Amino acid sequence: PTSHGVPSCGWLVQQHAMPGKFDRVRADELELNAKERALLARGEDVIGEDGSALEARWFRGGERAAVSVLFSGDTAAQPPEWKPSVSPTLLIHEATFLSEQQEKADEHMHSTATGAVASALSVNASVLALTHYSNRIKSSNQSEQEATAVDTDLPVLALNDNDRLVVDDDGTVTHLRWEKEGWTPTSIEPNR
């Protein structure tokens, strides 16, 4: 839930933790047949043709962490109802105003860029993406500068129309910004 004067909502999209990748090279080295590979890939231990035991865990890399994106709609900073079941990899949060318009933000139940940082810290987000700016803000860089001025190691980026975000399985966020020459990618490592 969000905290706003009119109906508004947010969404949490989550990919749960996944098993590590299957080690095909090791399976090739041991000359495993298709049935043995399939059983091991499903997590089942196998007794080889020679009677040796093969444990499925020997053929998997480390578990890939859960990845999640929390999208806020219009909201005041730090809605008391926010209690996500996981710390989001990426929080996409409105930053309608700058801190100099805090009273207006409070009056209309919107956030400032620093309020968005407070929201991100309250849910332990790894990366914060700002969006939804008032027309009083001439450049999204103003919001980004205000947010990054807060003394924290939280990576912050400011979104503009037509930007794209890609969240990889390892939690790396790639910000794609369209420029005259094409898409310009910027990778942001999570703060975890």
PLM segments and residue spans:
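Active-site-proximal loop/helix segment associated with metal-binding centers of metalloenzymes
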Residues: 1-71, 75-84, 90-92
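Binuclear metal-ion centers of metallo-dependent hydrolases, dominated by the metallo-beta-lactamase
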Residues: 77-192
